[in-house]
Amino acid sequence: MYQPVIISSGLVGWQFMQRTYDQQLSTFNDSAEIKRDTDYFVQNIGSIETAKDLVSDRRLLTVALGAFGLQDDIDNRYFIEKMLSDGTTATDALANRFSDSRYTDFSAAFGLGPSEARGALSTGFAEEIVTAFQANSFEIATGNQDDDMRIALYAERTLPAVVGGTGSETTKWFSIMGQAPLRSLFETAFGLPEAFGQAD
């Protein structure tokens, strides 16, 4: 698989990444493993009707979770199935209990809860999920060489949506603190102790 090129850390490395990002991402997306998984997702996601269907297909679930940065939950099948089958419309739904908005976004996108419209039936849904999966996978590959660069790429991609969201300032702050890469960025930028994210 293609490994991102990082010439150095710090500002020089970031500027190089900014200049070469589109080309590097395109090359990364053409890697056999990424292409195989994303092609499979596009061809098969339309047949998913229930949460159980999705968690039963590891290849589909890999792309689905990876699109939301939740790839570490791949082996928590019962947890993911429960989250998807609960949906997000009920206030006591599992996804709504987390400060990390990625879980709510994930469940809402697939729409497999009670009385929810299945996301897979929406025009452009598969392509949108694939694009997010590719970006997140590239960030992970970048982080294998330079974790600070990964955090910067993740923040550049996700922070505008958090800041531009409709929630209160408190909600936005909790959303930032609930996402490990963003929390790490803010802890470093403001010199906050690691325990700050766990403070009530």
Segments (PLM) and residue ranges:
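Extracellular/secretory-pathway and virion-surface proteins
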Residues: 122-167, 193
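Hydrophobic, ordered structural segments
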Residues: 69-75, 82-136
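Short, recurring structural edge motifs at helix starts
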Residues: 46-53, 90-95, 158-164, 169-176
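Exposed alpha-helical structural elements
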Residues: 16, 37-40, 50, 79, ...
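Extended intrinsically disordered, low-complexity coil regions enriched in Ser, Thr, Gly, Ala
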Residues: 56-62, 66-86, 174, 178-200
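The feature marks the first
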Residues: 20-75
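Alpha-helix boundary/N-cap detector
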Residues: 29-32, 36, 59, 97-101, ...
